[in-house]
Curated annotation (Swiss-Prot):
It comes from Synechococcus sp. (strain WH7803). This is Photosystem II D2 protein. Keywords: Chlorophyll, Chromophore, Electron transport, Iron, Magnesium, Membrane, Metal-binding, Oxidoreductase, Photosynthesis, Photosystem II, Thylakoid, Transmembrane, Transmembrane helix, Transport. The D1/D2 heterodimer binds P680, chlorophylls that are the primary electron donor of PSII, and subsequent electron acceptors. It shares a non-heme iron and each subunit binds pheophytin, quinone, additional chlorophylls, carotenoids and lipids. There is also a Cl(-1) ion associated with D1 and D2, which is required for oxygen evolution. The PSII complex binds additional chlorophylls, carotenoids and specific lipids. Chlorophyll a PD2 binds at residue 196. It is found in: Cellular thylakoid membrane.
Length: 351
């Protein structure tokens, strides 16, 4: 008689770590968490530190922290000085040489927040991929989240990489982002860019689709509860439908003459529209990084310059852009010591 004794399979450190990372807990960690949690913590902490204590006097010549009197809307972590170029501004690098105060003065916190923020967003997308795989569903949430990542990377990293330095990226603050939008309009005529138009159509179109879809579902809920509040009649595990797709189809068929008859196609469309808007606007920002122009109607500009009585909304916008450039550049880039002669300042077509 032969007795076979099985040997327990060898478990290496990788298997032990894999089990610990994927353990069922209140906040799932996962392999993506190794990237997500440290980078998100450092990015948020860097932003809170910068907006609370760090001045922008040495980079932009302005106050930008709560300590200097700013509020939540005007505080920001400002971009590094123009002279820093595209340096990563490492704390131990040749610029700061390990001096934390000097590092903050040069704008090192902005580079710190931007890079850690980008990796945190990527980690969050990978987290959605990882959990979708473990749960056994498709990864469309992660694919959709690539839209915000594309916008962040193109605006905060790709655009300044195409310009002379990190200085021209947006600073991390509410009013700072508004200033950046004015800059994009004045120097790139961004609102007339077709990629911006597609981005606006995607974002506002997505909001419209979301509102229409939510209202339609609420309109066609089945009266399947005895309570005054219809929300209490829903159970997450119920097998039957909670609203009538047929009734919704009849409603919109009467309104537009056409309506979605397939829930899968409807929800894919709701995914596609805003994500494509984010992607196309990101492509447009990369075009701005390369200083590509779009929709420059030079013939109208020439005619407006020659004929004081000829003016279009386009030529009026061009004059507004010239004003933005003329008055924004000296204030925004004081280190350049811009001086504009009186004759080049915009005064309107008739003068």
């Amino acid at each position: 008689m032969t007795i076979a004794v099985g040997r327990a399979p060898q478990r290496g450190w990788f298997d032990v770590l894999d089990d610990w990372l994927k353990r069922d807990r209140f906040v799932f960690v996962g392999w993506s968490g190794i990237l997500l949690f440290p980078t998100a913590y450092l990015a948020i902490g860097g932003w809170l530190t910068g907006t609370t204590f760090v001045t922008s006097w040495y980079t932009h010549g302005i106050a930008s922290s709560y300590l200097e009197g700013c509020n939540f809307l005007t505080a920001a972590v400002s971009t590094p000085a123009d002279a820093m170029g595209h340096s990563l501004l490492l704390l131990w690098g040749p610029e700061a040489q390990g001096d934390f105060v000097r590092w903050c003065q040069l704008g090192g916190l902005w580079a710190f927040v931007a890079l850690h923020g980008a990796f945190a967003l990527i980690g969050f997308m990978l987290r959605q991929f990882e959990i979708a795989r473990l749960v056994g569903i498709r990864p469309y949430n992660a694919i959709a989240f690539s839209g915000p990542i594309a916008v962040f990377v193109s605006v905060f990293l790709m655009y300044p990489l195409g310009q002379s330095s990190w200085f021209f990226a947006p600073s991390f603050g509410v009013a700072a982002i508004f200033r950046f939008l004015l800059f994009l309009q004045g120097f790139h005529n961004w609102t007339l860019n077709p990629f911006h138009m597609m981005g606006v159509a995607g974002i506002l179109g997505g909001a419209l689709l979301c509102a229409i879809h939510g209202a339609t579902v609420e309109n066609t809920l089945f009266e399947d509860g005895e309570q005054a509040n219809t929300f209490k009649a829903f159970e997450p595990t119920q097998e039957e439908e909670t609203y009538s797709m047929v009734t919704a189809n009849r409603f919109w068929s009467q309104i537009f003459g056409i309506a979605f008859s397939n829930k899968r196609w409807l929800h894919f469309f709701m995914l596609f529209v805003p994500v494509m808007g984010l992607w196309t606007s990101s492509i447009g920002i990369i075009g701005l990084a390369l200083n590509l122009r779009a929709y420059d109607f030079v013939s109208q500009e020439i005619r407006a310059a020659e004929d004081p009585e000829f003016e279009t909304f386009y030529t009026k916008n061009i004059l507004l852009n010239e004003g933005l450039r003329a008055w924004m550049a000296p204030a925004d880039q004081p280190h350049e010591n811009f001086v504009f002669p009186e004759e080049v300042l915009p005064r309107g077509n008739a003068l």
